[in-house]
């Protein structure tokens, strides 16, 4: 099995499309190590795409903050503004999806995926 491992997409549809184009026909399955949203201008488009195309996703710190699971008070000013905007922009279905993402590590085919580190998702 050949995996395309994505992480820190941060709602950047344009960059996601560039990565997918570069990797075209060179993977069997996509995995995501979190931070689907945060910073970028396309939180719903990216989340919709991830929901439809990525069977295994773990949550990242921005997924938690943007969906209201975790406080973002320690974020820098730009990240705070982005988090508020993303939270207000997400559809209810995408908000629920992000809230339901599992904490890593998650075992996949003999290895683990995580956001941060296997010891802590925020490391």
PLM feature spans:
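Beta-strand-turn-beta hairpins that frame and shape the catalytic cleft
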Residues: 1-4, 106-112
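Core catalytic region of metal-dependent phosphoesterases/phosphodiesterases
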Residues: 2-99
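Residue-level detector of flexible, active-site-proximal loop/helix-junction positions
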Residues: 10, 105, 120
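Structural preference for beta-strand elements that scaffold enzyme active sites
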Residues: 56, 102, 111-113
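Short, flexible active-site-adjacent loop segments at beta-strand->alpha-helix junctions, enriched
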Residues: 61-63, 102-104, 117-118
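Active-site-proximal segments of metal-dependent phosphoesterases and phosphodiesterases across multiple
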Residues: 74-81, 111-123
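Short, charged beta->alpha transition segments
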Residues: 97-109
């Amino acid at each position: 099995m050949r995996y395309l491992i994505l992480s820190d997409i941060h709602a950047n549809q344009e960059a996601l499309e560039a990565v997918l184009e570069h990797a075209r026909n060179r993977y069997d399955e996509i995995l995501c190590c979190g931070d689907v949203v945060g910073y970028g201008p396309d939180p719903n488009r990216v989340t919709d795409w991830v929901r439809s195309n990525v069977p295994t996703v773990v949550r990242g710190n921005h997924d938690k903050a943007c969906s209201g699971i975790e406080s973002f008070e320690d974020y820098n000013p730009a990240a705070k503004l982005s988090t508020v905007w993303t939270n207000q922009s997400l559809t209810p279905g995408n908000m629920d999806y992000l809230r339901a993402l599992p904490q890593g590590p998650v075992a996949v085919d003999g290895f683990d995926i995580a956001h941060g580190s296997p010891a802590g998702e925020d490391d």
